[in-house]
């Protein structure tokens, strides 16, 4: 296992990871290399579960994979590409070895300590037109021209199920997110996500930078990589340093989705930030704001791999990364729940959101003020953000139930309710009626 130390553009041998299959799942064992431990600038890859020390670290969680290794592994999309192009690996470790180039964070892997990971160049924006058809074909199980391997193979390690490709220009790396055959044909997911980035920024929430482009009739969302920094070499070419990354799942030491349970907990994550964050007070407040925002906009896919932390410049601690993967989900039942536990449960009600505000170092009054401000900002701006992202009036009406009703709608509903009470001859409480209580 290799790591890119702060500012470095080449990996340093960090240690050895073995994963053995067992009847119960798997056992993972990791040992830091003595050469790594002897370096004054060595950094722990997980300060909680893998502190810098000699000796063996072991785990049986997640089939014997430490969370930081799961974060660096390909997800549904990448695994599917690897299976299609190279055949299914004999073990999950094979996915770590066969995915190259674009994995999130600063870890990398090879088969032996004297064989550094392959550093493949990334394609530029000029491949995007061809990529629309290529990735659509891969999603349908069609193998592509072997000549395209040089830009498909380095793009298998990023998480999620959507077709994607990491590209690079002279200044930044971008994660290009493509349409999926599973998308609603009437709504552009790229435009939806771009609109929510803008809406979150209206609410004072830090988000990833994104750019919406159209290529060959397809909407693509380019998301700037927050874990890569361009470094100019002496020959004028661009190399890339890499920053460490951990998901909320790793911070929470969770094994992921379990039947009849939530995929993480916002209050629990806030409490764990004390050990992980370089600035826990600021990160807890930001996390609370994101929790409120996700509840208010019906982003119910806010599971613990859709929140991340990136190492600070010195690699000494972590900070919340910019918010990402936010899309409203049209409710299908009257009872709405978030993927992560919000307060006492996962319901996105104001009372529940405020029920564990002390975990975020906030008073009830402070938490209530943040909630009400975000709700009002969303109510006032969501249609404008949809419009600026090129979403139609029909799309707005389709997703209107995801957002707080306008004040006009609230007042109209109140008037209708009041009239119904009068017409029904309700003899109950006189509160709220002319001349009443």
Report the location of each language-model feature:
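Phosphate/dinucleotide-binding and metal-coordinating scaffold of catalytic cores
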Residues: 1-304, 308-437
């Amino acid at each position: 296992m290799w790591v890119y130390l702060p500012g470095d553009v080449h990996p340093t041998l960090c240690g050895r990871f073995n994963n053995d299959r067992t009847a119960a799942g798997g056992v993972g064992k990791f040992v830091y290399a003595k050469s790594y431990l002897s370096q004054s600038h060595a950094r722990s890859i997980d300060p909680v579960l893998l502190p810098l020390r000699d000796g063996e670290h072991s785990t049986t969680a997640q089939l014997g994979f430490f969370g930081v290794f799961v974060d660096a592994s390909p997800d549904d999309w990448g695994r599917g590409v690897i299976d299609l192009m190279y055949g299914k690996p004999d073990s999950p470790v094979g996915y770590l070895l066969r995915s190259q180039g674009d994995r999130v964070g600063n870890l990398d892997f090879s088969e032996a300590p004297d064989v550094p990971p392959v550093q493949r160049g990334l394609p530029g924006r000029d491949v995007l037109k061809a990529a629309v058809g290529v990735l659509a074909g891969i999603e349908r199980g069609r193998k592509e021209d072997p000549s395209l391997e040089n830009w498909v193979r380095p793009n298998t390690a990023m998480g999620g199920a959507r077709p994607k490709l990491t590209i690079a220009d002279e200044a930044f790396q971008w994660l290009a997110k493509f349409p999926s055959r599973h998308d609603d044909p009437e709504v552009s997911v790229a435009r939806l996500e771009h609109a929510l980035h803008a809406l979150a920024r209206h609410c004072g929430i830090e988000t990833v930078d994104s750019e919406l482009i159209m290529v060959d009739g397809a909407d693509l969302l380019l998301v700037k990589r927050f874990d890569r920094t361009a470094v100019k070499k002496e020959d004028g070419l661009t190399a890339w340093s890499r920053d460490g990354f951990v998901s909320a799942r790793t911070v929470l030491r969770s094994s992921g989705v379990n039947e009849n349970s939530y995929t993480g907990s916002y209050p629990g994550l806030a409490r764990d930030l004390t050990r992980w964050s370089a600035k826990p007070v600021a990160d807890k407040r930001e996390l609370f704001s994101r929790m409120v925002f996700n509840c208010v906009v019906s982003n119910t896919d806010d599971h613990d791999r859709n929140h991340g932390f990136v190492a600070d410049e010195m690699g000494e601690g972590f900070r919340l990364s910019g918010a990402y993967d936010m899309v409203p989900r049209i409710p299908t039942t009257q009872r709405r729940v978030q993927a992560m536990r919000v307060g006492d449960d996962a319901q996105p009600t104001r009372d529940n959101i405020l029920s564990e505000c002390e975990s975020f170092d906030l008073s009830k009054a402070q938490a209530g003020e943040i909630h009400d401000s975000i709700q009002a900002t969303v109510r006032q701006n969501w249609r404008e953000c949809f419009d600026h992202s090129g979403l139609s009036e029909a799309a707005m009406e389709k997703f209107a139930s995801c957002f707080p009703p306008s004040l006009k709608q609230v007042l109209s509903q109140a008037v209708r309710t009041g009239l119904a009470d009068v017409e029904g001859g309700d003899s109950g409480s006189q509160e709220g009626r002319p001349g009443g209580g």
